[in-house]
Amino acid sequence: MSQTSSESQSLITPTFVFAWLVNFAQFTVFYLLVTIMAMYAIEQFQASDTAGGFASSAFVVGATIARLFSGYIVDAVGRKRTLVVSLIVVTIAMALYFPAQSLPLLFVVRILHGLGYAIASTAVMAVAQSVIPDHRRAEGTGYFALGTTLATAFGPAAGLAIVHNAGYNAVFIVALTLTVVALALGLVVKAPAQEQRSVTFSLGNIVHPAVAPFGVFILFVGVAYTGIITFLNGYSSDVGLEEGASYFFLAYAVVSLFLRFVLGKLQDRRGDNIIIYLS
C-alpha cells in the first residue's frame, strides 16, 4: 500500500487532532460558563431565577438561530474560512463578558457567543468529517465526540471549583484563554480542499419531515439535560452539596467515555438502529 493510500485510511491525522482540540476547547468553554452563568446573573445583577436561567440559556438561543444556516455558510464560504472567522467572533464575545456590567448586556453577549459557537462547531465538525475514512465514519465520529464527553466532565467541575475558590472573573479568564487557544489551532489546521459548486439556501435546508422525529427526540433530551446543568450549581449550594455537583458531571462523563469506545464500532458493524434501541 502506498504512503498516500495509507494516510487516506488513517483515522488519527494532524487535521483530525487539531479539529478535536478545537472542539474540546469550545465545549469546555461552553460547560465552564453554562454551569455558573445563572448564579452569576443572580449574584452580580440581582436577577430573578427566571432571568438567571435566561442568562444561561440565551447562549442556546443564539446557537439555535445560527444552526439554521451554519451548514449553508460552511458549504458556501468553506470549512477553514468559516472556522477561523467564527472563532474570531467567539473570541470577541468571550472578551466582552468583562465589560458587560448589566443584565441586558450580558444577554446580548451570551447570544453573540452562541451564534459564533454554533457556526464554529459546525465548521470544525465538517473539517473532522472531511478526513475520516468512509468505512470508519461512525467510529471516527465517536472518537471526535470524545472531546465533547470529556468537556462535560472537566468543564462544569472546573467552573464550579474556580468560582468557589477564585470568583467569576477567574472563570472568564480561563474561558478566554481556552478560546484564544482554539483560535490559534483553527488558524493552523489544514482542511482538505472542497469541490467548488453552487450552493443555494432554501427552507428545505433546515426543515425536512423525515428528520422531525429525531429532532423532537433530541429536543426533549436536551431540555432535560440543560435544565440540570443550568440550575445544579444553585441547587447544590442550597442543599450544601457543592462538591456533589462536580461528581455528577464526573460520573456522567465516565459512563459516556466508556460507551464512546464501544458504540462507534458497533454502529459501523450493525447499523444505526441497534444504537438507537440501546440508548
Task: For each feature predicted by the language model, list its residue ranges.
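Helix-breaking motifs and short loop linkers at transmembrane-helix boundaries and internal kinks
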Residues: Q46, G78, P99-P104, G271
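Conserved MFS/SLC helix-loop-helix module at the cytosolic interface between two early adjacent transmembrane helices
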Residues: I65-F98
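Cytoplasmic helix-loop-helix junction between adjacent transmembrane helices
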Residues: V109-G147
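Helix-loop boundary and gating motifs at the non-cytosolic
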Residues: I12-F45, G52, Y225-Y235
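Extracytoplasmic gate region of multi-pass secondary transporters
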Residues: V34-T35, P213-F248
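Short hydrophobic/alpha-helical segments at membrane-entry points of transmembrane helices
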Residues: A19, P104-R110, F214
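Residue-level signature of mid-helix packing/kink "hotspots" within the transmembrane helices
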Residues: V60-L68, T152-A153, A253-F261
